Design a protein with these regions (language model features):
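Catalytic-core segments of thiol-dependent peptidases
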Residues: 171-190, 197, 201-299, 310-311, ...
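Terminal, contiguous helix-loop blocks that mediate binding/assembly
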Residues: 255-507
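A short beta-strand micro-motif common to beta-rich folds, especially ectodomain repeats
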Residues: 87, 98-113
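Sec-dependent bacterial lipoprotein signal peptides
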Residues: 1-26
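Bacterial Sec-dependent N-terminal signal peptides
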Residues: 22-45, 74, 107, 113-127, ...
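N-terminal extension/subdomain marker
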Residues: 125-222, 498, 503
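Structural recognition of the beta-strand scaffold that forms the well-ordered cores
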Residues: 131-136, 166-171, 225-229, 304-308, ...
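Surface-exposed binding patches on compact interaction domains or structured appendages
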Residues: 36-39, 43, 59-88
């Protein structure tokens, strides 16, 4: 016998049927798509020259059209449909002014009128706030690393770090050939354009280097210039005879200054293929620091900074040679792993403040933090420092007084100096401060030295991992951030150091 439903059950049944009906009705209704129109950027920046192009992407739910105000630029296309469309903007004229120029704007609207967007168009000034040069002379076994460095730079540029500043890359593809290219930002990507190709290059000659930088000044003029130099490095040591010949390596003696090198520190490769970096590529194709200084002086440039992506270039002898062509030297007193600087991390700091400035703290910190973790536990080695070149001559005056007041340096076997390489015998590079502390016992002079060292190589920029790499991990027990060859008994040092500007200024 079926029991009659109570009023409560009837209410529950009816409620469930009503909910089911509403759900089915909602599922059958067609969902109306919300009208939308977006652009990848609200400002397009054209380079300063006529014909330069920049792009942005339009994403739309329906047909759209574009109108412009202002002038001095062309746009294509001016309409599109559903989906994504790339719009290209082209400069009609050069911007000959010294400031960014507002050319106009583009108004985009859906055909239904339900959404719109505006993109402004500006043109970079004829003279950039800064131009950074990535200088990569032929360095043999580092070429593939240079290509990786450039790819890392492109990652940074794709983040729109340049703004109105410019970045050019000089890259040698062989001992005699090379090219000059500009990297720039466009629509979320890094693009490049070739500015010039070179044949029969000899970058060991001052005239060649001057010619390269004269062209850069002409093509990418700027209020300020910075440069990164990637290659193998050997501090101030003359290009001729900078390495050890095979016979010398076996005999444990140093070659004469004119010996053609056959064995270099970067040729000591670890079992898993790791090696390090020299300012040049070996033998007669290396560039002396004095030659580079002569060339840049002739080009009429004083860099804001020279960032050496090379071994041993944080050297007081090097700093003295280059003091008049740069405000700062960013370098390592020891070897740099062949990978070099992590440019995807470093480049944003070289284009700080909207591309107009640079952040030395950020550069040093990003280098240090990268190498703290680099291929641990065998190769997490790195050291960096910044030398203030305007303080180098004052440091030379202090050092001259110390030399005049001190007897000749005699090594103390109980207190070995902090050395920065272990592949040449005798060692060529030692920590400057450690050397001075053992050379001089005059308290007043040492206090003066400490104070001047703090101004010349500021402590906040002296960063290093626990070890540096030189044929293996080597401990850092004291670190002033800068080396000297003064205490070295190496033949190449003894035969040449008295010809350096630093030696002449301090003796």
């Amino acid at each position: 016998i079926q029991q009659p439903e109570t009023p409560y059950l009837q209410i529950i049944r009816r409620t469930l049927w009503l909910l089911l009906a509403v759900t089915l009705l909602a599922g059958c209704e067609k969902t109306e798509e919300r009208a939308g129109l977006t652009t990848t950027q609200d400002e397009v920046v054209l380079r300063s020259t006529a014909g330069s192009e920049a792009a942005f992407t339009v994403s739309s739910t329906e047909a759209w059209s574009l109108t412009t105000t202002g002038g001095g630029f062309d746009v294509s296309p001016t309409r599109g449909g559903r989906g994504e469309t790339t719009v290209t903007v082209r400069a009609q004229d050069d911007n000959t002014t010294t400031r960014r120029k507002a050319l106009g704007s583009m108004a985009l609207r859906l055909s239904s009128g339900k959404a719109e967007a505006t993109v402004s168009v500006v043109q970079s000034p004829a003279v950039a706030p800064q131009t950074v040069v990535m200088y990569l002379p032929w360095s043999g076994n580092l070429y593939t690393h240079f290509l990786q460095n450039i790819e890392d730079v492109k990652k940074a540029v794709a983040g729109n770090i340049l703004r109105d500043s410019r970045l050019v890359v000089f890259l040698q593809t062989s001992t005699t050939k090379g090219s000059l290219r500009e990297l720039y930002y466009d629509n979320g990507e890094c693009r490049e354009t070739e500015l010039r190709t070179y044949e029969n290059l000899d970058v060991t000659q001052a005239e060649t280097i001057t010619g390269i930088f004269d062209y850069i000044k002409q093509t990418a003029p700027a209020e300020r210039y910075g440069i990164t130099i990637g290659s193998h490095g050997m501090a101030w040591i003359p290009a001729s005879g900078s390495g050890r010949s095979t016979a010398d390596a076996k005999a444990g003696t140093e070659p004469a200054a004119t010996t053609v090198p056959e064995k270099w520190h970067w040729e000591y490769v670890s079992p898993d293929g790791q090696f390090t970096r020299w300012f040049g590529d070996g033998g007669s194709r290396c560039t002396n620091t004095t030659t580079f200084a002569e060339a840049i002086t002739a080009a009429g440039i004083r860099f804001e900074y020279i960032l050496f992506d090379d071994c041993f270039m944080s050297s007081i002898e090097v700093a003295y040679d280059l003091r008049k062509i740069t405000r700062y030297l960013i370098a390592s007193p020891c070897e740099v792993m062949a990978y070099g600087y992590p440019y995807d991390l470093v480049m944003p700091y070289l284009f700080a403040d909207g591309g107009t400035g640079y952040d030395l703290d950020g550069v040093c910190r990003s280098f240090y933090e990268f190498y703290e973790q680099y291929e641990a536990p065998n190769y997490n080695c790195g050291a960096i420092a910044v030398t203030v070149c305007d303080q180098v001559e004052t440091m030379a005056e202090v050092m001259r007084r110390i030399n005049n007041a001190s007897p000749a340096y005699i090594p103390d076997p109980e207190k070995p100096l902090q050395q920065y390489e272990y592949l040449y015998d005798p060692t060529r590079f030692y920590d400057l401060a450690d050397y001075v502390y053992q050379l001089c016992d005059d308290t007043a002079l040492l206090k003066e030295f400490d104070e001047q060292l703090g101004r010349t190589v500021p402590e906040r920029y002296r960063l290093h991992t626990e070890y540096f790499y030189s044929g293996g991990k080597r401990p850092i027990t004291t670190y002033s951030g800068i080396s000297t060859s003064a205490p070295s008994t190496s033949g190449i040092v003894v035969n040449n150091i008295q010809n350096t500007g630093w030696y002449k200024a301090t003796h």
